[in-house]
């Protein structure tokens, strides 16, 4: 895969974010955003369904939208972290079946445990970085505890 011009529109698998412009015909064919997602990954799901129906998805760098981050969630960073992975797990269960869902969940567990095992190394960092690593460790700990419920 070669370089691409970031100033030119480009066909992509997924566009993520707060603004999507879609053809009415496409929405009629594939449906709206799936409300089963609490938040996060619903746009990935929509793009997947668009591709499955034969539509193409483009990223257009000239399109600019002002997004005031977090205005729709009002969650703590830890809650948002858990919700992000909830959305990903729901996506895998919905589109790839139980086996892939379980494999992703197991991979997520091992990756989270690895991150948690590395968290003591945070004490070797300067205080601001140390705090960031310790905060992330607390998020991964919460994620591990929530995995059986997901």
Predicted regions and their residues:
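A C-terminal cap/extension of S-adenosyl-L-methionine-dependent methyltransferases
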Residues: 1-2, 6, 10, 27, ...
């Amino acid at each position: 895969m070669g370089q691409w011009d970031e100033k030119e529109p480009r066909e992509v698998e997924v566009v993520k974010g707060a603004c999507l412009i879609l053809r009415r015909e496409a929405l009629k064919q594939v449906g709206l955003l799936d409300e089963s997602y609490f938040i996060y990954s619903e746009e990935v799901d929509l793009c997947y369904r668009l591709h499955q129906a034969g539509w193409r998805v483009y990223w257009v760098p000239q399109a600019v939208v002002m997004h005031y981050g977090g205005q729709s969630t009002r969650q703590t960073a830890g809650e948002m972290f858990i919700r992000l992975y909830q959305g990903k797990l729901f996506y895998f269960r919905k589109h790839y079946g139980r086996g892939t869902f379980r494999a992703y969940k197991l991979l997520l567990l091992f990756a989270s445990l690895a991150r948690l095992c590395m968290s003591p190394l945070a004490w070797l960092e300067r205080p601001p970085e140390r705090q960031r690593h310790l905060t992330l460790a607390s998020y991964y700990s919460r994620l591990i505890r929530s995995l059986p419920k997901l």
